[in-house]
């Protein structure tokens, strides 16, 4: 496969990278500036959950905007043209919803009281938000079952298997060391955030290995 990119594809890749970096940095800075006074974001587990939540929400929002406005989406999503977005809208919409729900759930759990800070959400409120997001994730997953073709299903299966191997290696090894007293066991929220980030990393690895991250 010829991986050499022409001028327009190179410009599109640069635009995607720069736009993603700027938007991600701006959203993260704004969030940390406004949430650090209420939530204990010096806790590594909470900070990891916030980072994972922001990443998932931004991914979902970008895909959702692209699905709603195909003309604009064709400029920053990795598609041939707006017509492809229209054709794939049935897959893009539920995928965007899943990402946003997962991100909201992680952020809600991270913003509960901790340390000497009251938290932006009470534990009860965060529990309700997390439960609602989880229920919606189940519904969205069932909704997506009939909308995913065999190729995308194989990508999902492969990335899920890789994420399982990575999480077993990382958290299994960590658990063994914690049992022996060499390290402290990871906080539950850190475990959830770590699993979410590993799934994301596995997904990018799988689609990248298939050449699907190259600008089109």
What is each model feature region?
Residues 25-33, 165-182:
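Hydrophobic alpha-helical transmembrane segments in multi-pass integral membrane proteins
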Residues 102-126:
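Membrane-helix boundary elements
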Residues 7-49, 94-95, 103-112:
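Long, highly hydrophobic alpha-helical transmembrane signal-anchor segments
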Residues 82-102:
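Membrane-water interface at loop-to-transmembrane-helix junctions
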Residues 147-165:
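Membrane-helix boundary/juxtamembrane motif in polytopic membrane proteins
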Residues 57-76, 136-144:
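Membrane-water interface of transmembrane alpha-helices
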Residues 42-62, 117-134, 191-195:
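Alpha-helical transmembrane segments
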Residues 36-40, 175-192:
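Extracellular/periplasmic helix-loop-helix junctions in multi-pass membrane proteins
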